[in-house]
Curated annotation (Swiss-Prot):
Gene3D superfamilies reported for this sequence: P-loop containing nucleotide triphosphate hydrolases (3.40.50.300)
Disulfide feature: none
One Gene Ontology cellular component annotation held by this UniProt entry: cytoplasm
Species, as recorded: Spirochaeta aurantia
InterPro entries cross-referenced by the UniProt entry: CobW/HypB/UreG_nucleotide-bd (IPR003495), P-loop_NTPase (IPR027417), Zinc-reg_GTPase_activator (IPR051316)
Pfam families: cobW (PF02492)
Name of the protein this chain belongs to: Uncharacterized protein in trpE 3'region
Source taxon at top rank: Bacteria
């Protein structure tokens, strides 16, 4: 398999409960409407609260 010269920037956002991760993600989504984002949400627990708090936006 030939290696690609294309690179994709990746940012990993981590933090403690209540540190503002979801707030930051929602702010980025609002302030950069033309930017394409991919999110991986890793939730533990019975209720998927963070997924509900991250605003749903569809790519054009």
């Amino acid at each position: 398999m030939k290696a690609s010269s294309h690179s994709t920037p990746v940012t990993v956002l981590t933090g403690f409960l209540g540190s503002g991760k979801t707030t930051l993600v929602n702010r980025l989504l609002k302030e950069r409407p033309g930017t394409r984002f991919g999110l991986v949400v890793n939730e533990f627990g019975e209720a998927a609260l963070e997924s509900q708090l991250v605003e749903s936006r569809r790519a054009p």
